[in-house]
Amino acid sequence: MPSKQSNVTWVTDRLAVGHAPMSHAELDALKSEGIDAIMNLCAEFCDLHEIQRQAGFEVYYMPVVDEEAPEMKELEQALSWLDEAVYLGKKVLIHCRHGIGRTGTVLNAYLLRRGLGHKLAGRKLKNMRSKPANFEQWWTIRRYGKKEGRLTIREPSLEMKNLVDLAPFLEDYAGLSGRVED
């Protein structure tokens, strides 16, 4: 459902999609929504990602030309970043200029990565503005879906449940590595 405050649509409580923020007021509205990380897909705005960083957001910049789709390797790297950001509890916005085709392509690939399969992903995107908008984008999703496969061991989900607190492990590791270096 679109947020009235910043014109983003929340896919989950940690993942939103929308158009490129084109003013400091829109960036402030994103902050007030709790968004702290942005995946910027805009190739047409060469400095927008820097403005977003300066505004205090963590930014993953993957420039994709309008009406095109990312290369499979770039898509995989972007989805790995997105998985990590969501796992770490960050609220992430995925955007291109208008929040439609490129945004929808990456979102659809993320749904497939989370195990939803083409049918469930299609149902999730059905009433959303963000979805692949042309043949190249749909073809990329089809290829990605074949590569990724479908989850059969557990129920697919977009929610990150049972997050693991790594702090005790990291503290032990720091202590051990300190002893080894001495």
Positions of PLM-derived features:
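Secreted peptidase-domain scaffold signal
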Residues: 180-182
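Cysteine-dependent PTP/DSP-like catalytic domain, specifically the C-terminal lobe
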Residues: 88, 106-171
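Ser/Thr-glycine-rich phosphate-binding loops at phosphate-binding pockets of nucleotides
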Residues: 103
